[in-house]
Amino acid sequence: MILLKELQIKNFRSHSDSKIEFDTGINLIAGRNGAGKSSILEAILVAFYGLKPATLRKNDLVRVNSSGYSLSLTFSLNGDDYTISRKSNGESILTGKEIVEGDSNITEWVERHLCPAHVFTGAIYVRQGEIDSIIRDDESRERIIRQITRIEDYENAWKNLGAVIRMLEREKERLKEFLSQEEQIKRQKEEKKAEIERISEEIKSIESLREKLSEEVRNLESRLKELEEHKSRLESLRKQESSVLQEVRGLEEKLRELEKQLKEVVERIEDLEKKAKEVKELKPKAERYSILEKLLSEINQALRDVEKREGDLTREAAGIQAQLKKAEEDNSKLEEITKRIEELERELERFEKSHRLLETLKPKMDRMQGIKAKLEEKNLTPDKVEKMYDLLSKAKEEEKEITEKLKKLIAKKSSLKTRGAQLKKAVEELKSAERTCPVCGRELDEEHRKNIMAEYTREMKRIAEELAKADEIEKKLKERLEKVEKALEKQETVLKYRQMVDELKALENELSSHDAEKLSAESEEYRKVKERLDGLRGQQKILLSSASRIKELKSSLREIEEALKNVESERGELHRKIREEGFESLEELEREVQSLRPFYNKWLELKDAESRLESELKRREKLEDEISEAIAKLEEANGKAEEIRGQIDELLRIYSEEEHRRLSDEHLRKSKELAGLKSRLETLRESLQSAEKDLKFLEEQLAKMDEYRKKVEVFEKIAIPELTRIREKFRKYRNLVAENSMREVERYASQIFEELTEGKYSGVRLKKTTERGKEKLKVFVVYQGEEREIGFLSGGEIIALGLAFRLALSMFMIRGKIPLLILDEPTPFLDEERRRKLVDITTNYLRKIPQVIIVSHDEELKDAADKVIFVESQGGVSRVRYVEAQ
C-alpha cells in the first residue's frame, strides 16, 4: 500500500519554492486557472518516473530565469518511508529502506515495487480532460484497455514469432543456396593446389639466381670499398698539399711586410735622435716662460678683481646715500600721520556696533529679498501659493479614489472575459459536436443544441454589454486620472514654493524689530572711515620701516669707505710683486713673456721625442725577432709540402679513377637486377600466401557442408513447424486473455458504477461491434434490466461512468485494491448543479480509497475534501497555503 506524504518543488513550472503535505482521505488542490495546480501532479509523476511518461521536455519544466529544477517526494510503501529526489541535471537518489542512485535505476525500482509507468498514467493518475475520454472516445478507450490488460503484449509476441519464422525461412534458403555450390568449390580447390605448386617452383628458380647475383655484388662492393678508401686518401692529401702551399705563400707575404716595417722604423729612429738633441737646448727658455706666464696671469686676474670690487663698492655707496636721504624725509612725515590715525580710530569706534549688527542680519535680508524676487518672477504671492497647496492635497485624494475604482473595474472585466471565453469555447464545441452534448453529456439533438446555444448567446451578449459599459467607465476614469496626474506633476514645485513662503514669513517676523535704514547708513559710514584708517596705517607702516633704517644706513656707508681703502692697498701690493721679479711695469713683464712664447711652443712640439725614440727602438728589436721566426716557419712548410707530394705520387700508382667509375656502374646495374629479383620473390610469396589462404577457406567451406545440411533438416522438420504451432497458440491465448480481462474489468466497473449511482444502474457491458467494416469496443449500461448506450446518461453520470472505468482498471491491475487515486480537473464544462450532483455521487465511494488527490478550481469539491491545499499565482510565482476543510 502506498501513501504520499510530502512533495517539495523548486523552480518547476511556475513554482519557485513550494512544499505540499498530503494526508489520508481526500486532498483537494484548489485555485484559479493558471495558478499552478496541475504542475503539482506533474511533479509527482516526474518524481516517480522521470520525464518519459510525462511526455515533456526538461526545458519546458524549468522555471523562467532559473538554471534547473529539483523535486523531492516522500511516500510510505507497505509501512516503510522512502524519499525520491530528482534534479534536472540528472542527479537523483532514492533513500529509505534501500538506497538507489541514478534516474533510470530509480524508475526501474518504482516500476518493480509500485507499478509500471503505463499503469500509473492509465489508472492511478487521471489527467485533465481524460476522466470521461475513456467513455466518449472509442479509440482512446480501446487503446487504454489494451495497454492495461496487456493484450498488446500477446499481440506483439504473436507478431514477433511471425518475424522469427520468416527469418528462419530466409536462413534455410540461404543455406540451401550455399549447399548447391559444393561441386564448384571442389573444382576451385584443385585449381588452387595447381596454382600453389607452380608459384613454389618459380620461387625456387629465382632464389638460386638471386644467390649467384648476390655473390657478384658482394665482390664488387669489396673492390669498390678499397677504391673508395684510396680515393678518400688521395683527396685528403691533395687538401693537405693545398693547405701547406697556401701557408707558404702566407709566410712569404708576411716576411716581405716585416722587412718593410723594419726599414720604416730605422728611418724614424734617425729622425727622433735629432729632435731629442734640440729639446735639451730649448728646455731652459721654456721653463722661464712657464714661470713668467703664470705670474702675469695671476697679476692680471688680481687686478681685474680689485677693479670690480672698487666699482661695486662705489655703486653701493651711492645707493645707500640715496636711501639715507629718503629715510630722513620719511621720519619727518611719520609724526603727522600718527596724529591723524588716532583721530580716525575714535571716529570708527562710534559706528562699529551698528556695523557688526548689520553684518549679522545681512544674509537673512539677502535671503528674504531673494525669495521675494523668485516669487515675483513667477507672478506668485504667499496667498496664491497657499491656494495651490490646497488644490494639490485634493488632487492626491482624488487620485487614490480613482485608482481604487480602476482596480475593482479591471477585476470585474477580467472575470467577464474569462466567462465569455468559456462560453465561446462551449459554443464552438456545440457547433462541431455530433451525438453527445459536450456541456451536459446527454444525447445531442438539434433542439437541445439550439436551446443551449441561445442561452449561451444571450449570456455572451449580456457580458459584451457589461464589458462595453465597463470600457466606457474605465475610459472616463482614466481621463480623470490623467488630469489629476498632470496636476500632481507640479507637486514638487508647489511644495518648494510653499516652503519658500514659510521661510519668507519667518524672516520678515525676525527683521521687523530692527531699523534697517539707520543700520545701513551707519554701516556705510563705518566702512568709509575704516577704509581711510587702513590707508593711513599702511603709510605709517611704510614710513616707520624707512625711518628705522637711518642708523643702519650710516653704518653701512662707513664700512664701504673702509673697504675702498683696502682695495687701493691691494693694487699697490700687486705692483710691488712685478718689481721684485726685475720688471719696472706690467707692460715690461708682458713683453718678456711674448718674446719667450715661440721657444716654449717649439719645446712643446718636440718634448716627447725621447719617449718616442725609446718606443721605436723596442719596435725595431721586436720586428727583427719576428723576421727570424717567419724564416724558420717558411723552411718547415716547404719541407712538409715536398713530403705530401711524394705520398700523392705513390698513391696514383695504385689508384685508377677510370677503373673506379667502371666498377661503380657495374655494381649499380647488378644491384638493380638483384632488387628486381627480390621484388619478384616478394610478389610470388604474397601470391603463394593468398593462394594458400584461399585453399584453406575452400577446405573450410567444404567442411561446413555436412553441418549446413543438418541445419536445413532441423529448420524444415523441427524449428519452423514448432514455432508455427506456438504462434497459433499465442493467437488463441490472446483472444482468451482479452475476453477474460474485459469480463473482469466489466465486473469491477459494474460494481463501482452501481454504487456511484446508488443502484440506478445495475451493470456495465463491454461489447465488440462492427461499424463501417471496422471492429470497435463499445460501452453499454444496464438500466432496469435492459442494455442502453451511453447517450442515455446525463453529464454527471457520464463522469461517474468514466470514474468507474478508471477505478475498475486500477483494481484489475492491482488485484482489486486501490490505495491511491489522482484526478486532475474531473468536472470540465459541468454547471453548478451537475458538479454538486457529481460530488454527491462520488464522495462516498472515494472515501473508501485510502488516499485521493483531486485538482480542481470548483468550490463545490471543498465540501467533500478532508484537506484543502490552495494554490495562487503572485507575480507569476505559484504560492501554496492550506485552507480549513468545510
Swiss-Prot record:
Its cofactor is Zn(2+). GO terms for biological process: double-strand break repair. Residues 183-360, 400-433, 489-518, 545-713 form a coiled coil. Residues 392-489 form the Zinc-hook domain. The keyword rRNA-binding does not apply. Keywords: ATP-binding, Coiled coil, DNA damage, DNA repair, Hydrolase, Metal-binding, Nucleotide-binding, Zinc. The keyword DNA repair applies. Gene3D superfamilies: 6.10.250.70, Helix hairpin bin, P-loop containing nucleotide triphosphate hydrolases. GO terms for molecular function: ATP binding; ATP hydrolysis activity; zinc ion binding. Zn(2+) binds at C437, C440. NCBIfam families: PRK03918.1 (NF003034). Belongs to the SMC family. RAD50 subfamily. Part of the Rad50/Mre11 complex, which is involved in the early steps of DNA double-strand break (DSB) repair. The complex may facilitate opening of the processed DNA ends to aid in the recruitment of HerA and NurA. Rad50 controls the balance between DNA end bridging and DNA resection via ATP-dependent structural rearrangements of the Rad50/Mre11 complex. PANTHER family: ABC TRANSPORTER ABCH.3. Homodimer. Forms a heterotetramer composed of two Mre11 subunits and two Rad50 subunits. The two conserved Cys that bind zinc constitute the zinc-hook, which separates the large intramolecular coiled coil regions. The 2 Cys residues coordinate one molecule of zinc with the help of the 2 Cys residues of the zinc-hook of another Rad50 molecule, thereby forming a V-shaped homodimer. This is DNA double-strand break repair Rad50 ATPase. It comes from Archaeoglobus fulgidus (strain ATCC 49558 / DSM 4304 / JCM 9628 / NBRC 100126 / VC-16). The lineage of its organism: Archaea, Methanobacteriati, Methanobacteriota, Archaeoglobi, Archaeoglobales. The gene is rad50.
